């Protein structure tokens, strides 16, 4: 017997299925961890984000907002890195991080929390579009285990993941606000959180989402006012988020990302036909990436039921709701088009990164259709149609990856059997039983997919025990410049007992609380990187050693002297004869027993230089004495009879200002990298103050204030409009039960 549930769920059922959604996500994470305990601690998570949390947390505990750390050089401008300095939840993550030694555990717990947030956000969206709670829960449990999210954003690209988690709540709250069932504050807050993760893709995707929702609500409600109201509030959130990106925009000219060109190439552009693989768990799509053409992971997979379930939608009834679902369809279509190119749009590169948006849009569309118009009448004919769809899935997956055709056959047969079981439960028992099986099926599929992808090609295998790593690593005081190449470390030596007991790459130095030049940086500093041929992960070319000790002609000082570097660590695989060569003048070779296999170490003969006279690195025809020093400000007492110059161990980022005895004076950049100030002739004990602030910080602060003022105005309008005499809900308003859920979650 087919049981049809009401579209107006009770508060109790909304909470129960919301809890089921959260528990389902937790169970799914457990399945993934059984396949690979480090799945959520790999690639950029281990090499960029988690070490960054540790460093930022230590500085926040010291009462400092670390917008700039000069000793980190081209990775030290954290106003333009993915630090999330204006994102309160991210700051909380940072604050906790230094207290946790087990980084795998911490990263996994943090990501689990955001996966639950994401799942509940998708659950909310389904409800505001009228889905029954069971199908909404299926969508919520499924979304964290869609291909690209599971294997890239959750495993590696943390800011993309957190931005998506906040964005889906902005979507749900945006629809509620447009339909008069919620206020502007949730829309503003969730959008701001998505924008301020400090990663451009979620910000742009949030804009795409709001545009799609605005179009959808205009089509659905046939009036401009709700849409304009939503667009204004969203614009205010974007205005507040401007402070996050202004420093990057105003610094772009000196970074690797200083182009506004639109180019197309095949790298990580995904043909639309790959979406036909969305329901076959074994699928390995075909497009160009780091690993060639056929991918080693099912990154276009969305959900096992997504395509076959189309056979069980009552399309005659669904056609009557096309206006209400326009927003979801527009979003899914726009995301699908983006994945196919262009390959680069200014700072936006690699269109495959938008695959989670395709998954989100299609999953929402199908689950809302099922949640409102699922039917199991004529189930035999519909079953045949579903079998045909599964056959098409197999054909497309075979076309992309013919060598694994047997795995695709097994997956297709398993999918057919699972679908048949769900249909039987829906016909003989209830929708609840059918959906429960659908949710349970998510877990073994996630396990099999992750286990099948082992060993993951993404892992750096950095040590995850901070205490053990600190104990194993040399006690390097001061500032260290490492010249090495990560590619030269054999896979078997990427362990704490191997190379990682002596070498750092990416942000690993932050895990062990050592001060190293640079770190993981997607932005870089073009001229500094060129000077030392240093790449995004701190790897260098073989010529870096010569360049580091080359004399800068205008100062007569070597590059390492201008940087106030205390130590140079040479990767023996890159410089096998290093220790047999004479040390540069003023330097000496120092033995570190137990580390000779991997590194040769040069230190200054007269001890640490970074602790002397602030960050002054060169003085010409003048005297200069540091009187005060912080990461963003250098105060110096200077004198010069005939005019001179002071050079600082600071990278010449946009945002510096210089004053002499309170009067602004210009500054220069030596070798396109080092900040230098000309001292006027006749200066005697003058106070020189060099200060850095994130460029555009005043505009950004004003934008935040203006955004909040605008929000207050729209909140006043909303409260004023909810007086008791307000009109009854419109005929096509969303179910009351859905509004209750959003009230609880907003």
Label the predicted regions:
Residues 437-626, 630-631, 663-665:
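Soluble catalytic regions of membrane-associated enzymes that act on cell-envelope
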Residues 26-118, 141-153, 157-164, 268-285, ...:
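Membrane-interface coil-to-helix junctions
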Residues 84, 234-321:
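Periplasmic/ER-lumenal interhelical loops and adjacent helix-loop junctions
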Residues 49, 613-746:
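Active-site-proximal, structured, solvent-exposed surfaces of multi-pass membrane proteins
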Residues 117-129, 134-219, 229-248, 335-336, ...:
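Membrane-embedded helix bundles of polyisoprenyl
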Residues 181, 202, 326-339, 343-345, ...:
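Contiguous transmembrane helix-bundle modules in multi-pass membrane proteins
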Residues 1-33, 229, 431, 710-746:
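Start-transfer (signal-anchor) and selected internal transmembrane alpha helices
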Residues 222-228, 310-334:
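Membrane-interface helix-loop-helix junctions at transmembrane boundaries of multi-pass membrane enzymes
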